[in-house]
Amino acid sequence: MGMRITHLGSGSRGNSTLLCSGGTRVLVDCGFSLRQMESRLHLVGVEPQSIDAILVTHHHSDHSRTAKRASEKWEATLHANLETATKMGWQPMSECRTFGGLDRIGISDDLSLLPIPVPHDDADNVAVIATNGDGRRAAIVTDLGESTVELNKHLIGCSHISIEANYDSKR
């Protein structure tokens, strides 16, 4: 079983990455308008209602803009760490499943996610290591200011590593 990684967009106007493994579909970040998200998913042949989960890496709007609305409309489970959920005003458990750093999230037998805290201008940013049912791993790292020993340790053995490192704290 393979894992498909599709970058739907990356930049200050929005970020989102689609992970597919077996029958499981997960969005890492949902930072575009709902119409743009649906359009981008359709462009890659994915029905928005087939999304199983949305994981938000941090609270900045270019990563989180429509995550809650999309999760409600598509009936996808919303995941964020407690700091992000609090900053977004999402109610843990009723509106959002919260996780701690390095708490593995089992989405299905086909896909699990491991959030890894990474430095950014706010303390709530996480990278994501996705593992499929065959044990293949992929890393999605956004807004990385600098790497950490913990992140480097988890990047070893990944068959795909995507790093967005265009963040500038002086801008």
Tell me what each language-model feature is.
Residues 33-80, 159:
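Active-site metal-binding motif and surrounding structural segment of the metallo-beta-lactamase
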Residues 41-45, 104-109, 151-154:
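Short amphipathic alpha-helix with an adjacent loop that forms part of the alpha/beta core around
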Residues 76-84, 164-165:
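Short internal beta-strands
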Residues 148-171:
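Cap/insert and terminal regions of metallo-dependent hydrolase folds
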